[in-house]
Design a protein with these regions (language model features):
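Glycan-processing catalytic domains of CAZymes
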Residues: 1-176
């Protein structure tokens, strides 16, 4: 990990927040520790010793989940920000009819909760579209397809703007 940090984080083109390189912890909810604060402090310390740089740590939270669920993981661990995984990847057809409204309410709750209870910033993430069937059309049949739609993307951009955290940033999740 430290070698990777040394290789990438010192690059002047690497994304930074408050002059700190941003590091996204992809499955932070599965990073188990008896003392999450100590774990994250050790990550920061080891990278600082190797590179001389302070980190801006971002934890990726699973979609459609409440922030309080991760109290013993990254919330008390001291990450700087949280963002939620692709909100289109879910198995509820009812939600798909009003994605912008439902996602806005989810983001609003999580943004306020993380800031009020943990002083952790929130980064909204939006997606341009989503098609789970591209992997296998037989076992993902119950996941709604979200086709490329300029109007929906515009609405999702507005949802992101409404829910910006202390650092105005949006992650565009367009993996498929």
């Amino acid at each position: 990990f430290v070698e990777l940090a040394y290789t990438f984080l010192e690059d002047e083109l690497y994304y930074r927040i408050d002059n700190k390189p941003m590091l996204v912890l992809w499955n932070a909810h599965q990073l188990y520790s008896k003392d999450s604060k100590k774990l994250y402090d050790n990550i920061r310390q080891r990278v600082k010793e190797a590179t001389g740089l302070d980190l801006y740590l971002v934890a990726r939270q699973p979609n459609w989940s409440p922030a309080a669920r991760f109290h013993n993981f990254f919330m008390t661990g001291g990450v700087d920000a949280v963002y939620m995984d692709n909100m289109f990847n879910q198995m509820d057809w009812a939600r798909s009819y009003m994605y912008p409204q439902y996602i806005n309410e989810n983001y609003k709750y999580n943004r306020q909760y993380t800031l009020t209870n943990y002083n952790i910033d929130f980064i909204p993430a939006i997606s341009t579209s989503y098609n789970a069937w591209m992997w296998n059309g037989t076992d993902r049949y119950n996941v709604p397809i979200q086709m490329h739609d300029e109007g929906l993307f515009h609405d999702m951009c507005n949802v992101a703007k409404i829910n910006l955290g202390q650092h105005p940033m949006v992650i565009i999740d367009a993996f498929n």
